[in-house]
Amino acid sequence: LQVIIKDNSLVLTPSHIKAYMLMTLQGLEYLHQHWILHRDLKPNNLLLDENGVLKLADFGLAKSFGSPNRAYTHQVVTRWYRAPELLFGARMYGVGVDMWAVGCILAELLLRVPFLPGDSDLDQLTRIFETLGTPTEEQWPDMCSLPDFVTFKSFPGIPLQHIFIAAGDDLLDLIQGLFLFNPCTRITATQALKTQYFSNRPGPTPGCQLPRPNCPLETLKEQSNPAVATKRKRTQALEQGKTFIF
C-alpha cells in the first residue's frame, strides 16, 4: 500500500480509500477477535495481491493479549504510527495501539504523505499534540500515571475538517474515533466497521478495480526492501567484472 500512496500518478478516490480501510479493519477485527495484537501496522505492512485483496503482513511484533496484568514492551510500532500511550511508556495496553496506527494510515491515504512524521519519541508526541491538541486529564484519566509521562504545553490542536478538507462528516467521525487519546474509549475495529462511513455512499471499490502501481515488480521490491536493490547492484557489478563496496 505504501507504493500506491507514494505514486502520484495514481488518483485515489473516496471509494478506493474506503476499500483499503474496509479490508484493513476486517483483517484487524479477525486478529483482535483471536486475541492477537499486530503491533506494527503501517502502509508498508499492508500488501495487495493481484486481485486487489489487501493482506496484513509482517507479524514479527505480533503478540497475544488478554491475560490480566500482563506487561508488554512499549518499544513496538514504527514511530510515526505509534499510539501516545506507547510513547509515554505504557507496558499494559490493548487493541488501541493497532487502532491508532489505522488512524495514521487512513490519514496518510487522504493526504498522500505521512501524517505525523516525528524524528524522536519526544518529537512524535509534540507533533501529535500540536495537530490533535494536548489531552486533558478529563479526556485521558490515566495519562499522568504512565511510566514515561512528561507534561507538555497545552496545544489547542487543528480542527480535523481543516486538515482533511475533502472528508465528509462520516469520515471525520471515524478519524476522530481512531485518534481518541484515551485507549479505553478509542474505537475498536468492530465498532469502526459499523460506523456510518462504511454504510454511506460511495461504496468501496471492488478489489479487481483498485489502482495498480505503474512501476515494474522489481522496482516495487526494491522500494519496499533496500536489500533487494543492494543485491541487484552487487550482482551487476560482479557480472561486469567490477569491484564495489556496499
Report residues per predicted region.
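Conserved end of the kinase activation segment
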Residues: 86-97, 115-116
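Catalytic-loop of the protein kinase fold
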Residues: 32-48
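C-terminal intrinsically disordered, low-complexity extensions immediately downstream
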Residues: 201-246
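C-terminal lobe substrate-recognition/regulatory segment of protein kinase catalytic domains
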Residues: 134-177
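Conserved activation segment of eukaryotic-like protein kinases, specifically the C-terminal portion
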Residues: 72-86
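A conserved short helix/loop substructure at the end of the activation segment
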Residues: 172-191
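Activation segment signature within eukaryotic-like protein kinase domains
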Residues: 20-21
